[in-house]
Amino acid sequence: MKTLSIKEPYASLIKNKVKHYETRSYDTKYRGEIFIHASLGKKEACDELWKMVGKVLPGYIICKANLVDSICMDDEFINEVKKNPWEYKSGYYKPGRYAWKLENVEVIKPIKAKGNLGLWNYYSLEEVMNLLSDIKYGYMNNAGNVCYSFDTFDDDYVLQSYKDMLKTKTGVCFDQVELERHYLYNRDITSYFICYYGEFLQSHTFLVVKENNKYIWFEHAWEKFRGIYEYNSLDELLNDLKNKFMNEYNILDKDKILLKSYSKPKSSINLSEYFKWVENK
């Protein structure tokens, strides 16, 4: 859903139905339902406005509303707004600026999220899984061609960016994690790498989402276990995945398995460079 980050106390003033216009220097053509996200920072406001909001939740989506209009301010409009002093004090009104009109405000269960500038997209995990539904398992080689045969994978694989993935609609787990990272960047996410270094080499990457003190294994690339799985602890999640990995590939020696988190790699690196990154970062 489209989301708007607003500093406190103004986000909570919308939630509490004191503020009905979000004032901006620019227009928007978007009309429809939006989330209101309380930014981490605070904005200067008079004591009376702070008293109207009570406890605030910076870093959380706190309500939703309908964005029904974007009004270019003129003197007549501003004079009308001034009839409601709290509305006027809750925004920056000047001819040529815009007032985004919000209606049907509804308080929701707070959702922890990282904010962004302008209108940005917040996706549920189910929505992201649906966005990935047309992604096929394959890879892009160093000539920019999409491949579904893995005969030369070790020699010509390159890691795609999320923009590449949106074009090719194809990727192995390494690539798919980067597309998932793009969609879920505003969540508490960690990417993980698991690899067996034995008589053969087998690896996998996946994403873990922390949400409401739960740990979620988000899996799309591994078709057999495609889905969203919730656990009470990170250890429980990682142990379950490790056991599934060992059973899937008939691995008996768990001491030859590396399971670790890794940070976002650069795109367009080859397989050797990718392994060096995930093994050491």
Features from the language model and the residues they span:
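Structured alpha/beta reader/binder surfaces that contact nucleic acids or chromatin modification marks
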Residues: 1-127, 192
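Short, well-structured alpha-helical interface segments that form or flank functional binding sites
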Residues: 16-18, 57-62, 168, 172-179, ...
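Hydrophobic/aromatic-rich core segments of domains that either
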Residues: 175-250
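Charge-rich, solvent-exposed alpha-helical interaction surfaces
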Residues: 131, 237-244, 274-277
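Active-site donor-binding loop signature of nucleotide-sugar glycosyltransferases
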Residues: 104, 220-222, 264
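Alpha-helical and coiled-coil interaction segments, frequently adjacent to or embedded
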Residues: 246-281
